[in-house]
């Protein structure tokens, strides 16, 4: 009856599903006594971990924009994300000479958000995981 939106890839899919269920006045049950500890990439080698980190940064901002666009419209989503887009762009340019790690993080955030704004599908981000 309720399915995940396959346009989401990696982030916001459960938030979207809950919002859609709530919009039709159905119930959502929360078990707040359950705790899960996740170490996030601790079991992979450094190169794979870097690709995974790039992938996460790209997908988080892609999904964040898409979620807001889907539920509140393109203009609203653009309005709330425009300052981030500008900040990520300036940061990734400025940090190139000072911090390669922060440069890389902001570059993937910028391109994930920009890709969502111009309508590129989130599935292209899988290529980030396979790069050398």
Task: Give the location of each predicted region.
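Terminal low-complexity segments of carbohydrate-biosynthetic enzymes
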Residues: 63, 84-132
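Bacterial peptidoglycan biogenesis and beta-lactam-recognition machinery
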Residues: 2-5, 24
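C-terminal extensions
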Residues: 1, 17, 128-132
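Solvent-exposed, flexible loop/coil residues
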Residues: 8, 12, 40-41
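Generic alpha-helical structural signal
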Residues: 6-7, 102
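Active-site-adjacent helix/loop segment of glycosyltransferases
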Residues: 19, 23-100
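Acidic donor-binding loop at a coil-to-helix junction in glycosyltransferase catalytic cores
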Residues: 3, 10-17, 56
């Amino acid at each position: 009856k309720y399915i995940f939106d396959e346009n989401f890839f990696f982030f916001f899919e459960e938030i979207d599903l809950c919002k859609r269920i709530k919009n039709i006045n159905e119930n959502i049950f929360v078990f707040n006594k359950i705790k899960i500890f996740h170490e996030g990439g601790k079991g992979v080698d450094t190169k794979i971990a870097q690709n995974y980190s790039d992938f996460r940064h790209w997908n988080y901002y892609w999904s964040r924009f898409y979620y807001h666009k889907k539920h509140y419209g393109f203009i609203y989503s653009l309005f709330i994300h425009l300052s981030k887009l500008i900040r990520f762009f300036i940061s990734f340019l400025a940090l190139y000479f000072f911090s390669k790690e922060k440069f890389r993080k902001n570059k993937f955030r910028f391109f994930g958000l920009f890709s969502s704004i111009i309508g590129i599908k989130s599935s292209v981000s899988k290529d980030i995981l396979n790069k050398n």
